[in-house]
């Protein structure tokens, strides 16, 4: 593990950019960016266009290590190059710590939750991540209802995979998302915090994780997790809130920083001039940084 990157993620001021939409969500990501489905005719063309979009973001002067601590990439992005370097190396040279989304999507909903689908060949993927200079990983589950046993199952699955990732020398970001429209959201979050704490308490002293959580309904509901010795950092997803709304509620939660995806790129468009594109990206970065660092 790279100690300098570890220290930056643990103590740095800033947030983590999530650029990891995968195959299933790519057409929507492109559409939001102003690229219509009739502009590409197969997956290869689609992934080339999305790589162009991500390259435009990553190479923008606004996108630098001053306010952005890390960036989460999709597997295809990790394997491609930006200006002649693998994406992870390009980011690292900019002072941005690279992470890789490793999950293969969500299983069907059962008992009010969606577990992760199995991740075949995870060991090979982690080997490749190490070769590409990736620091950590991210994997997502989804919680829709307050079912204590099912929530515990989600957390247990996440930590089981996390231990494999730690053994490979990488830092896992564990993401059990709570749906922002869940009717017992606050109660779900209390049960989730309890389940996560129990798993954290069982980690060895040299096993570190990060957490990516929905911004809690009860302010500072996750403070105990943020302060846990086995947790490097706790980051928040925007989860369907607008950027303004996400920033507003994030600002109230001490020690919680952003890891926004859609809320970061929502004002960017393929038709914008570079000047306009960079200005909109800078604006988004500045407001998300502010909500992550300057607490209410």
From Swiss-Prot:
Entry-linked InterPro entries: Aldolase_TIM, FBA_I, FBA_I_Gram+-type
Keywords: Glycolysis, Lyase, Schiff base
Recorded metabolic or biological pathway in which this protein acts: Carbohydrate degradation; glycolysis; D-glyceraldehyde 3-phosphate and glycerone phosphate from D-glucose: step 4/4
Pfam family, one: Glycolytic
Catalytic activity: beta-D-fructose 1,6-bisphosphate = D-glyceraldehyde 3-phosphate + dihydroxyacetone phosphate
Active site, per annotation: 175 (proton acceptor), 212 (schiff-base intermediate with dihydroxyacetone-p)
Any one Gene Ontology BP term: glycolytic process
Presence of the UniProt keyword Lyase in the record: yes
Keyword Lyase carried by entry: yes
Family, per entry: Belongs to the class I fructose-bisphosphate aldolase family.
Protein name: Fructose-bisphosphate aldolase class 1
Source species of the chain: Staphylococcus carnosus (strain TM300)
Gene field: fda
């Amino acid at each position: 593990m790279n100690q300098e990157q570890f220290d930056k993620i643990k103590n740095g001021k800033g947030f983590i950019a999530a650029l990891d939409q995968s195959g299933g969500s790519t057409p929507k990501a492109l559409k939001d960016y102003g690229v219509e489905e009739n502009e590409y005719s197969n997956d290869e063309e689609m992934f080339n266009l999305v790589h162009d979009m991500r390259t435009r973001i990553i190479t923008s002067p606004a996108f630098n290590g001053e306010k952005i601590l890390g960036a989460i990439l999709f597997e295809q992005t990790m394997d491609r190059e930006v200006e002649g370097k693998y994406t992870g190396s390009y980011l690292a040279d900019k002072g941005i710590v690279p992470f890789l989304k490793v999950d293969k999507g969500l299983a069907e909903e059962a008992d009010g939750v969606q577990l992760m689908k199995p991740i075949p060949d995870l060991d090979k993927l982690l080997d490749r991540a190490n070769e590409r200079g990736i620091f950590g990983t991210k994997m997502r589950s989804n919680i829709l209802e307050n079912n204590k046993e099912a929530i515990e199952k989600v957390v247990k699955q996440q930590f089981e995979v996390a231990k494999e990732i730690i053994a490979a020398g990488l830092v896992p970001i564990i993401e059990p998302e709570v749906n922002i429209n869940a009717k017992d959201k606050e109660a779900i979050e209390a049960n989730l915090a309890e389940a996560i704490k129990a798993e954290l308490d069982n980690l060895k002293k040299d096993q570190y994780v990060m957490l990516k959580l929905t911004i809690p309904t009860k302010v500072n509901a996750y403070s105990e997790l943020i302060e846990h010795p086995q947790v490097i950092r706790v980051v928040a997803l925007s989860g369907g809130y607008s950027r303004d709304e996400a920033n507003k509620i994030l600002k109230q939660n001490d020690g919680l920083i952003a890891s926004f995806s859609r809320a970061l790129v929502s004002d960017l468009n393929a038709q914008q001039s570079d000047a306009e594109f960079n200005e909109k990206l800078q604006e988004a970065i500045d407001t998300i940084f502010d909500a992550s660092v300057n607490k209410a």
